[in-house]
Amino acid sequence: MPFRALVAALVAALVAALATVAGLAASPLAAQQAPPDYAAAMHAAHGSETPSASPAARIQPRTAVTSEVVTYGTLDGKALKGVLARPSGTQGGPALLVPHEWWGINDTIKAVAARYAGEGYTVLAVDLFGTTAGTPDSAMKLYQAAMRNVPAGERNVAAAIAWLKQAGATSIGAVGYCFGGHWSLRAGLVGGTDVKAVAIYYGAPITDAGALARLKAPVVGFYGALDTGIPVDSVRRMQSVLTGSGRTMTMHVYDGANHAFANPSGRAYDAKAADDAWGKALAFLKANLR
């Protein structure tokens, strides 16, 4: 083939390849592969709710608990304040880091922290917002702001882990719900070998193998089969990455349950699924932290 004809053929092939790539980028398949908008999904799930704790959410701890506000570090010159709950009259022992849901540290999260403390854990509810949301719209904005600055959130979580270690924690786990479920997973990434167990309730997954390489702890996940905002298939992809590299992730999927099925203050509360998940979470934490 003459040289000019060869060049022309190569140019034509390159143009065709670029056109194909452009077509794929604009195709429905490419759109499906884009990262989901979890903030919008959370707004859809919680848009008709309020941050107020229902009477059912105020489940009393099994044993006496002491709760107080503590400063667990600083970030960009601002004090990081969280709620510390622990069995009355105790110091040290196994500890849990509990990131809040998308409302911030409200009464529901305080009750959750106290309930885990009633099971014998020192519990630190960390504040990733620096405030609480009063409406779904303000919660969505706080959620989006936090996810736009993940490095700051991870430094926040790292400060909480360091504080628990200095306070005498013999082992540390992380438990979170919704937005907090995603951040309990990130606590596992940040903490490395310092975090011995991660429990995720319907939290957004991370499927990138490089990002998950930091995770050393076993993971348990609790998800509703009807959750369209965080589909079970997306979480199974994370599970596949973890198990494929020799780590452990156990999933419990509840038929008929939706997102936030374990939140007694929410419209999707499913008492049967929530009770089952609670028992399984406690067994998982006991096996890995005690």
Regions found by a protein language model. Name each.
Residues L215, G221-Y223:
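Short beta-strand/loop motif that positions the catalytic acidic residue
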